[in-house]
Amino acid sequence: MRRAGLGDGAPPGGYGNYGYANSGYNACEEENDRLTESLRSKVTAIKSLSIEIGHEVKNQNKLLAEMDSQFDSTTGFLGKTMGRLKILSRGSQTKLLCYMMLFSLFVFFVIYWIIKLR
């Protein structure tokens, strides 16, 4: 149903775009289309970047979980070793403790010497 006075939908005055000259209106539309396309490409770039960040965060969380479990197992291993050393130090085996310290000192010296030669 058409309203009275609107005719076929074109405004009066010979302008087809509600009082704007065709060239000015088309220029505005082209600029809007260009800006819209520019905005669309920026939004797409930001979306892909955020997806990549999400994947990286998931990978880093997985690596952190693996490191946490490895640290827990290492903590348990070191705790057992320290317990054994405490038992060894409580006993009257000072000779064995001295040998163990000399051996570890020798191993560190050999490692230092190997690294120094490189």
From Swiss-Prot:
The chain crosses the membrane at residues 95-115. The keyword NADP does not apply. It is a single-pass type IV membrane protein. Gene3D superfamilies: 1.20.5.110. Interacts with SNARE complex members GOSR2, SEC22B and STX5. Interacts with LMAN1/ERGIC53. Interacts with STX17. Belongs to the BET1 family. This is BET1 homolog. It comes from Rattus norvegicus. The gene is Bet1.
